[in-house]
């Protein structure tokens, strides 16, 4: 079998699963269309997600579709706002592999036709605004970021999408970055006009969009909110095949947890079962398994650790992750926080700091172009005797590391909540979603962060408030099983 034949043979199962999946979706869509009976006089709900899938149905795309089916079967009219070559460039077709390639619009449209069989659809097709295009001509990246048009900060609206596509926070002033800004702003402006027309026509009672941060959904969210229309955003939950829906910011994962919510024995047991799997590395999120295996700390590490008074692990994030705009409150970005932390590390030679890169930082097909490994190399961090760096492809148990630590430092990673749950003191540099509750230490300024870190490092013992661990358990359970909806 030659290379071409082998390639075709390997693709057959993928093609088979793809078309079997489409057949199932089409069958279900027809059944829903046959059984859905809209309540007379009820206002519709608009669904829009242009940043969840292209040729294959993603989990977020499925969550949106299933939610729309549920509403239709309950008698609520639904209108799908659907892209049909509606942007000059979209986020999913603008990653590093295909910045300037033609977009796969035909494939995306074909899947939309299957998914929305028998549903009410309002499609939109792109047309460029000449005046806006002229205003955008020749701008630098800095000027794009600050760009406003007709009273709206389009540069800021598309900025998270550009960072996500470029896989970095600190953007370079190069052709691809300028092109993405230009095309995303032109597309966002067009979506706004089309969405305004749809709102005028349908007068919806609510709008449901994917995460609200990628520019197509962000501009739709803003347009609806200007009119006082409730907007629900959705993201993947922490449980497999679960979705988190909120009227706040989905990527910030804000929830309300009352003091009256206490775990029952059955709920405690359910949480323990989840934690047992989590601590073993047996979990997925958005269909991604971050840990193919999880190794214990080896003898060489333990021997090095024995030379120090204490161990403090430092957990980082992926710099372009959609949680970062919410986390960057005290510091401009995660690397600014690491720069500050490095100064603390240098004046505490008695402490072994273990800096851990996020396991998703170098994921195939989504590898970051601005990494913690680069920061470590640039700052000669591994030359420091009291630092061990664990890169993203080393599958060492973070939980064993936490158990051996005096306390832990995180930016805004979810492992901070798990550390609090294990009874450890946790110091956050970024605003994590769980930092809104009494679970961790989150200083409100860079100076306060340095002072808190110094105090924790010098303390002979750390008396963690008992409420931190109790709240961590309540919060994790609520996030997993109350705030998120199961779609399996």
Region spans (language model):
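Histidine-anchored nucleotide/phosphate-binding helix
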Residues: 57-80, 221, 333-346
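Nucleotide-activated donor-binding/catalytic signature segment of Leloir-type glycosyltransferases, i.e.
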Residues: 372-392
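Conserved nucleotide-sugar donor-interacting segment of glycosyltransferase catalytic cores
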Residues: 191-246
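Leloir-type glycosyltransferase catalytic cores
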Residues: 252-299, 439-488
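A donor-sugar binding/catalytic signature common to diverse glycosyltransferases
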Residues: 216, 394-441
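Conserved N-terminal ligand/cofactor-binding loop architecture of enzyme catalytic domains
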Residues: 1-48, 70-189, 236-292
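A short, glycine/small-residue-rich beta-strand->loop->alpha-helix junction that serves as a flexible
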Residues: 51-63, 209, 323-325
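Conserved catalytic-core segment of nucleotide-activated headgroup transferases in glycan assembly
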Residues: 280-378
């Amino acid at each position: 079998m030659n290379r071409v034949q082998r390639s075709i043979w390997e693709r057959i199962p993928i093609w088979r699963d793809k078309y079997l999946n489409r057949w199932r979706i089409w069958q279900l869509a027809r059944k829903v269309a046959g059984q859905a009976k809209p309540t007379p006089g009820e206002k519709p709900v608009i669904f829009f997600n242009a940043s969840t899938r292209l040729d294959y149905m993603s989990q977020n795309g499925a969550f949106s579709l299933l939610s729309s089916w549920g509403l239709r079967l309950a008698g609520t009219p639904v209108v799908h706002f659907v892209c049909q070559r509606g942007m000059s460039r979209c986020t999913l077709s603008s990653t590093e592999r295909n910045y300037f390639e033609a977009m796969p619009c035909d494939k995306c449209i074909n899947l939309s036709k299957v998914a929305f069989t028998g549903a009410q659809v309002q499609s939109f097709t792109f047309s460029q605004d000449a005046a806006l295009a002229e205003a955008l001509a020749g701008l630098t990246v800095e000027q794009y970021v600050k760009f406003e048009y007709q009273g709206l900060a389009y540069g800021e609206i598309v900025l998270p999408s550009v960072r996500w596509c470029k896989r970095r926070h600190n953007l370079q002033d190069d052709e691809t970055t300028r092109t993405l800004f230009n095309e995303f702003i032109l597309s966002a402006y067009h979506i706004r006009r089309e969405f305004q027309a749809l709102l005028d026509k349908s007068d919806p009672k609510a709008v449901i969009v994917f995460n609200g941060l990628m520019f197509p959904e962000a501009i739709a969210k803003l347009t609806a909110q200007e009119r006082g229309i409730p907007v629900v955003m959705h993201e993947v939950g922490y449980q497999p095949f679960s979705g988190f829906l909120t009227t706040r910011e989905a990527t910030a994962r804000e929830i309300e947890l009352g003091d009256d919510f206490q775990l029952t024995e059955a709920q405690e047991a359910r949480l323990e079962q989840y934690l047992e799997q989590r601590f073993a590395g047996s979990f997925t999120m958005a269909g991604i398994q971050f840990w193919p295996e999880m190794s214990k700390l080896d003898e060489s590490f333990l021997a090095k650790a024995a030379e120090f008074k204490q161990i403090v692990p430092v957990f980082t994030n992926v710099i372009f992750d959609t949680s970062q705009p919410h986390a960057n409150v005290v510091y401009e970005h995660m690397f600014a926080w690491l720069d500050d932390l490095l100064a603390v590390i240098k004046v505490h030679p008695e402490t072994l700091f273990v800096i851990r890169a996020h396991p998703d930082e170098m994921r195939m097909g989504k590898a970051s172009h601005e990494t913690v490994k680069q920061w470590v190399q640039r700052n000669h961090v591994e030359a420091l005797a009291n630092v061990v760096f664990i890169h993203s492809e080393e599958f060492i148990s973070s939980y064993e590391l936490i158990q051996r630590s005096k306390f832990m430092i995180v930016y805004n990673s979810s492992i901070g909540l798990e550390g609090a749950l294990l009874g450890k003191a946790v110091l956050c540099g970024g605003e994590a979603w769980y930092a809104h509750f009494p679970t961790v230490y989150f200083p409100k300024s860079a100076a306060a962060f340095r002072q808190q870190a110094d105090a924790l490092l010098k303390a002979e013992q750390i008396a963690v408030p008992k409420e931190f661990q109790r709240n961590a358990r309540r919060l994790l359970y609520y996030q997993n099983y109350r705030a998120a909806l199961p779609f399996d």
